[in-house]
């Protein structure tokens, strides 16, 4: 029977991949690869727009956490915890507590069932936005509907005092703060 259990390791936000590599290197350099079966940083793809161009990037689903299937002993626990950018193991009374099977299954399901990229910015009905491109550039509008599949916003734009419905790509608008 395997003594490996899943643990959640808290990291500095944005350092999840660096911590993953550091843990992998730690077990390799010390010849204890058998104590680490798997290490996971759940991510999702998001669509961003930089300089008017669409870019797909990865975002951590659980910012600040790495999940590792470990045969954990006190020595390995302290070595991992002393790595740069590692906060602590999640647990009670300062002792690592393994994740429940239910919890890790929910996390792994998200890893294995990656969805299509989602826009990084979301819009809500009734929200005011500014149009940044196209014939209605610099107009303000109200979001009526959002079509996530097509990446379109249905907006109401006030033109010459009349409310006019228009469909615009979400990349052509920005939130008004």
From Swiss-Prot:
Q: Per the similarity annotation, which family is this?
A: Belongs to the NusG family.
- Please give one Pfam family short name: NusG
Superkingdom of origin organism: Bacteria
* Biological role stated in the UniProt entry: Participates in transcription elongation, termination and antitermination.
Q: Which organism is it from?
A: Campylobacter jejuni subsp. jejuni serotype O:2 (strain ATCC 700819 / NCTC 11168)
Query: Which first-to-last residue range defines the signal peptide?
Result: none
Q: Name one GO biological process term.
A: DNA-templated transcription termination
This chain's protein is named Transcription termination/antitermination protein NusG
Per its UniProt record, what SUPFAM superfamilies does this chain match?
Answer: N-utilization substance G protein NusG, N-terminal domain, Translation proteins SH3-like domain
Report if keyword Transcription regulation is assigned: yes
Q: HAMAP family per the record?
A: NusG
CC per GO annotation: cytosol
| Keyword line | Transcription, Transcription antitermination, Transcription regulation, Transcription termination
Q: Which residues form the KOW domain?
A: 125-150
Q: Does the UniProt entry include the keyword Transmembrane helix?
A: no
